Amino acid sequence: MPTINQLVRNERKKVTVKSKSPALKECPQRRGVCTRVYTTTPKKPNSALRKVAKVRLTSGFEVISYIGGEGHNLQEHSIVLVRGGRVKDLPGVKYHIVRGALDTAGVAKRTVSRSKYGAKRPKAGAAAPKK
């Protein structure tokens, strides 16, 4: 605990909070252009081919972002909306592409957690048959 004299000489330092998604520049989302769409493998012990895209954002940053859901329509020069949120088993991937926004299509035939994947509500007649 510092004395009053010590506080007069040296004021208390403010704790600065470092952003986990600096490329968004304090915005909730950013628009960007895909420069490369490819698959990559996760860290041990997981095994898969995760779909990712390198995106040039309007903030000037070039980031690697994850494409969630089954199947996608992205290719080079696609315009995408990028949000924060890292992928734990992919090093360097700290952003997600928003499905159903701009050039990114929503996930087809998605019935649960639809809002996260840009999927419309299915028609009442096309609902799954009850058991």
Curated annotation (Swiss-Prot):
One of its GO terms (cellular component) is small ribosomal subunit. InterPro entries: NA-bd_OB-fold (IPR012340), Ribosomal_uS12 (IPR006032), Ribosomal_uS12_bac (IPR005679). GO terms for molecular function: rRNA binding; structural constituent of ribosome; tRNA binding. One of its GO terms (biological process) is translation. The keyword Ribosomal protein applies. Keywords: Methylation, Ribonucleoprotein, Ribosomal protein, RNA-binding, rRNA-binding, tRNA-binding. The modification 3-methylthioaspartic acid is found at D89. Disulfide bonds: none annotated. SUPFAM superfamilies: Nucleic acid-binding proteins. The keyword Ribonucleoprotein applies. Pfam families: Ribosom_S12_S23 (PF00164). Gene3D superfamilies: Nucleic acid-binding proteins. With S4 and S5 plays an important role in translational accuracy. Interacts with and stabilizes bases of the 16S rRNA that are involved in tRNA selection in the A site and with the mRNA backbone. Located at the interface of the 30S and 50S subunits, it traverses the body of the 30S subunit contacting proteins on the other side and probably holding the rRNA structure together. The combined cluster of proteins S8, S12 and S17 appears to hold together the shoulder and platform of the 30S subunit. Belongs to the universal ribosomal protein uS12 family. Part of the 30S ribosomal subunit. Contacts proteins S8 and S17. May interact with IF1 in the 30S initiation complex. This is Small ribosomal subunit protein uS12. It comes from Campylobacter concisus (strain 13826).
